Amino acid sequence: MTLRVAITRAAPEAQKTAERVRARGAEPVLAPLLTIMPCGYDTSTEGAQALIFTSSNGVHAFPDARGARNVPVLAVGEATAAAAREAGFADVRSADGDVNALAALVKTTLSPAAGKLIHIGGDHVAGDLSGQLSAAGFKVERRVAYAAVAAHAAPPAFSEPLDIVLFHSARAVEAYLALGAPGAGRLIAGCLSPTIAKAAAEVSWKRVITAPSPRENDLLAATIGG
């Protein structure tokens, strides 16, 4: 029987995940729990030694990559780094992990004396990146480029037969719980990180699977196989 996999992340990344799910022989079902709403914000990079992106949504919300293409970019993971390269940034480095790994990458490759850092992200950020970097002597300017707005009603997909639901952020889990965790007891929750799995543990699932590393391919391998 073909596994039916609910994808809770927002567009446009949801479509990319759907393609990867389909490539592994499962049936993707779009079930967005968040909508990404761009915010007007200061896009100037003057005086910045580097830009920091904690999600690909932040990259998509940056309107003038060509104007800043020579500013180094530090990204939380490979998906975000790939989005930055596609947007035209020339010097892109990936922490290949979570916010803690990103903070470590900044501290080992950059100097506080070289200029400020601009962190472009959403209205909700996992962890305390600014706090860690400020404690290490860096000046960090946080720019809120988008808001992740939670769904007010459960997507229709949760009324259909499903086997697995994928969570790429704790924010998506929070939105799911706020909707009453529809069908959780019969579903496998696939979580991209331990932080997300901890949020999901607020309710009972058929099973909770955590990716061995915060990479989508690892998440799909752990939940779907193939």
PLM region descriptions:
Residues M1-G226:
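Signature of uroporphyrinogen-III synthase
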